Amino acid sequence: MGKIIGIDLGTTNSCVAILDGDTARVIENAEGDRTTPSIIAYADDGEILVGQPAKRQAITNPKNTLFAIKRLIGRRFEDEEVQRDLKIMPYAIAKADNGDAWVEVKGKKMAPPQISAEVLKKMKKTAEDYLGEPVTEAVITVPAYFNDAQRQATKDAGRIAGLDVKRIINEPTAAAFAYGVNKVKGERKVAVYDLGGGTFDISIIEIDEVEGETTFEVLATNGNTHLGGEDFDNRVINYLVDEFKREQGIDLRNDQLALQRLKDAAEKAKIELSSAQQTDVNLPYITADATGPKHMNIKVTRAKLESLVEDMVKDSLEPVRTALKDSGLAVGEIDDVILVGGQTRMPMVQKTVAEFFGKEPRKDVNPDEAVAMGAAIQGAVLSGEKTDVLLLDVTPLSLGIETMGSVMTALIEKNTTIPTKKSQVFSTAEDNQSAVTIHVLQGERKRASDNKSLGQFNLEGIRPAQRGLPQIEVTFDIDANGILHVSAKDKETNKEQKITIQASSGLSDEEIERMVREAEANAAEDKKFEELVQTRNQADGLVHSVRKQITEAGDALPADDKTKIETALSELEAVIKGDDKAVIEAKQQALLEASQKLMEIAQQQSQAQGAGADANQSSSSSKADDDVVDAEFEEVKDDKK
């Protein structure tokens, strides 16, 4: 069996590693570098350049040189982050037919997985050159906070590159592998702070070594998949543009060639300021006007850089606090802090993290290489080459379906260990309903519309019956890659429908963070809404029950009582969709009081029909009601099919 290679597919740089004996080894590429720029360029002669060759020609070919594609993978064109990138990227971001964010090069639209596949191909070739044999299998890393669409798109990129992606593994977890395998003795609680080129993750991981076997259990994870070194670079670029405009009166934002040179200079300045107190950005002939050529010469100090990015560094601590809270650990219980990602080389980031955790981060983990090394270890575990490592990872967000009253009913809670499978029985909301719509959601809010819709599908052919009787079993299955599969089955007919959430219905990072943030900020509002929905559902059930009893009572119900009940019914139905819980409860009580005579008649009729047979029927009905959860499923009309 061939080697399963480990690939860190990064926003700025990528890296490939293998397990050599008992040690993970990073492989140098054809240029002799241990990391490869995640840059792809399309030359005029049709040649596709990847890595350093693409980066070298970027200044003269800005529109056809693609970088930071990971920020687009699995995203919708309308996403706020994509719209923001649209204004600063020198290449064209286009809207695909399915609404995804694609790029346009030389008049041709291309999907992000298609472009990322070019980087993966280079990683594959790098490994093949080193091993002297074909490589067909890989473990690829993704940010822990990547959603279902982004994970699926990453897997697609691997497939396009000719790789069988055996596992998608979270970047902080992979870094913990690189740190913990063969090194940790006993039990350690570790915080992995991963600030890369385009994404930020924090994972709290418990590493437990017993008799040579090491278990890695992710206790909680959080992050921001649109915060990274690229954003730091953009702050520097904007500062340089503003300074140049102030000095020369020329705005460079519309000059793609100048912007590409600025990007290169900003990145270099940022890196230099990690070891120096100041640097000069010197770009001769940056532009020209009627008076002649213009040159840029701007001094940037470390203090200035820190003032430009201070808010982003502070923002990174919010997900850290959330992850700690979700893990049930206090800051003082963290034994080790590991820094991953090139941006963590910035002294301000290191100082901020050290002050937060009250301890210096470890220096024995290479922030650029640890993730690929961990992926290689996972590859060796999957191939059976390494048997003394166990990984227990988690899903970052809750997953569920929309149920009666537009409520999000979670089947799998956030930070649940994966792979996992969970089933729950739901039922119909209307009598004789022949079809239901399963609406899959991702997020932390109670109101369905406040969460992200991942997709929906219909289950048809349900046997006509009273509402609440059909039993629809909904199953959520998250595989080890964190990718979701949903199925619904009518337990009586065994008819089943399945769906794998596709990248076209991806969830944007901003939406994820907004959902979690709002869930915490609006906990009281969520509880109030949940109580309102419960009251509405109770009222709806009462209306249904009373109408049925009126029909069954027939002429036995006096006309005066019937009129009172009909009036109370109308008044309750008029307020049932409103937002005032107290009003609904009052009208509900009024209907109960008006229905006293009706209930007496119903009881008399029930006794007359024979206690024995009715008791059995009642017991059966009660059991069915206990086993199901009312769900809001729309009946699929013929004109919708």
UniProtKB/Swiss-Prot annotation:
Superkingdom to which the source organism belongs: Bacteria
Cross-referenced Pfam families: HSP70 (PF00012)
Induction (free text): By stress conditions e.g. heat shock.
Gene Ontology MF terms: ATP binding; ATP-dependent protein folding chaperone; unfolded protein binding
Positions of modified residues (Phosphothreonine): T199
CDD domains (UniProt xref): ASKHA_NBD_HSP70_DnaK-like (cd10234)
Region Disordered, residue ranges: 600-641
Compositionally biased spans, kind Low complexity: 602-622
Keywords associated with the record: ATP-binding, Chaperone, Nucleotide-binding, Phosphoprotein, Stress response
PROSITE patterns on file: HSP70_1 (PS00297), HSP70_2 (PS00329), HSP70_3 (PS01036)
InterPro entries with a match to the protein in the record: ATPase_NBD, Chaperone_DnaK, Heat_shock_70_CS, HSP70_C_sf, HSP70_peptide-bd_sf, Hsp_70_fam
Biased segments, Acidic residues type: 627-641
UniProt cross-references to NCBIfam families, sorted A to Z: PRK00290.1, PRK05183.1, prok_dnaK
Function noted in UniProt: Acts as a chaperone.
Family of this protein: Belongs to the heat shock protein 70 family.
Protein name: Chaperone protein DnaK
Source organism (scientific name): Aeromonas salmonicida (strain A449)
Gene expressing this chain: dnaK
